[in-house]
Amino acid sequence: KTRSVATRAGIVSVDEILSELNVSSLNRLFPVDTRNEERTRAAGLHRWYELQFDTEVDLDLAAQKLSAVAEVANIQFNTKLEKMWDGKATPLRSDAPAMSAGTRSIVWPFNDPELKRQWHYINKGDKAVAQTAREGADINVEEAWKLTAGDPKIIVAVVDEGVKYTHPDLAANMWVNTREMTGTTGVDDDGNGYVDDYYGYNFVTNGPISWDVVDAKGDGDSGHGTHTAGTVAAVNNNGIGVCGVAGGSGNNDGVRIMSCQALSGTAAGSGTTAVMARAFKYAADNGASIIQCSMGIKGGGYTSDDQYAKNAKAEHDALAYFIATSNCDAIDGGLVIFSAGNDALDRAGYPGAFRDYISVTSFSPDFLPASYTNYGPGCNISAPGGDAYIASNSTATVLSTMPSEMNEGSDYGYMQGTSMACPHMSGVAALGLSYALKQGKHYTRNEFISMLLTSVNDMERYLDGTKESNGTMYLENYRKQLGTGAVDAYQLLMQIEGTPCLKVGVGAEELVPLTQFFGGSATNLTYTGVSMSAADMAKLGIETLPTMAYGKLKIKCTKSGVAKITVTAIGGGDKVGTGTVMGGMTITKEFAIIARGVQAGNGGWL
């Protein structure tokens, strides 16, 4: 334990009530971090206390009496959040079904043998994943990895079950508290209020991180935290297992995972507000730039931001503290990313639905909403979470790392849920911050979030008719309800780079206006050329070099992918000025082509 037991506050009016209520313990909710106590007090977090009562005490009456004391500003019950998944995990076995011949023949960007099964990163439309799989229903990370695969200076706090920090595909990307690792066992060597927090901390038991605690019925840990961590940053290009979105290139350059354990077996404190709040503040005080949290309250539990902020104030205050903390030169605050919820309700669950946090919905390999995903108000963006009901096995769900102790001896397994969509978003955000560092860019939090939420592909054209999954889904109900679109890692990096993106469809010739690149008079300019490398044309299956027609780009892509193209025009007149002839000047624009399904006229917004 890191905190001593006290029962009185030292304020007479408060202590009278505490004595009357037989309070068994009273402690500061947030332990003293000597390095950050001034900031803690400035944020008012030092005023939060956690009270425990004897079992026979009427808690409603206790809250009523305490709230009547002038010195007490807020009373909050220690409610629980839950994991956003369906409770089922399927181990990856050595006899797992083979992928199709086409998928097996692909030259993959990294040598991790199971990357071919991670459709959620690179989806080639393999029918071995699902008969309805669509090429491009992924996060478009393959080309992004050529620009960056992560940066160790970016720390992602996984607030979840404990992460198995000894996992062979995670160990190299775990955040390490070097002061504690090289210090004295049983001593708070870095003064942050926690003892022996080597890779993070177990806020439920106030002790070491665990990932394999179950009771006699098998209830308890499930591997959920290790699975979400692997999606963010399983080690890439190490010749084993799977890849992580921001897991590096095999050169010790992945982002780092901090395990902030908020669920532990069947312990009474698992997922409570007190535990969550401490985990969020710890992440801020110890260097994290992103909170990855695939947890929440069932949709409808809260129905407005004000209601959530009032009734979950300790948690909300801790998240506000995290948001106000800059731990990375690329951004002036922290990013908070939650799953939207698995209740198939027409609203997101809180905390994710709160306006300052990113709430992630889920799609499956068919580029359609997953059967379980929440949608509607409070939902910001969509990412792959899988859908077990569209395939005869688990291939249509998300493959990631698992603790072998919980997974029939396998280090890898499949899960589905907005819990699985959420870490894809956290991984893409981590890639974006990594690339911003590489480019020497700095953004406000709002600027970065705006780029993140507009780096999307359109799913709207598919939302007609029905989908057969866990029952019949009427797809029109999801129109404009899943967020801004399906997250696209490459588009985010292009926004950071400053290279504009042109979204086109696949399979049909298109005339694409260039107004957004050449201005309102783009159709009236004289264009002198279009250039594109043979390699880039091959990436998109372009057989004939694109041309300009009627002031628009004439292009036909037959493959999903990304590539660069350059268009040259004359600014002023129809010829370029020379030493002897008056004329205009050459204007050259390079942009990235994103070929992903068919692009709607709304620019990619759902």
For each predicted feature, which ranges?
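Hydrolase catalytic cores
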Residues: 229-232, 258-265, 281, 289, ...
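Flexible, small-residue-rich helix->loop connector segments that border functional cores
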Residues: 159-166, 179-192, 206, 216-222, ...
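Active-site-adjacent substrate-recognition loops and nearby beta-strands
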Residues: 242, 268-269, 274-276, 301, ...
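C-terminal subdomain of the subtilisin-like protease fold in secreted/lumenal serine endopeptidases
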Residues: 281, 286-295, 301, 333-334, ...
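Protease zymogen maturation seam
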Residues: 35-50, 64-155, 163-169, 173, ...
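Substrate-binding/access-modulating region of protease and related hydrolase catalytic domains
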Residues: 146, 150-152, 161, 169, ...
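Surface-exposed or secretory-pathway low-complexity segments enriched in glycine-proline
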Residues: 508-509, 519-552, 560, 591
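Acidic-leg catalytic submotif of subtilisin-like serine proteases
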Residues: 70-73, 134-209, 226-231, 235, ...
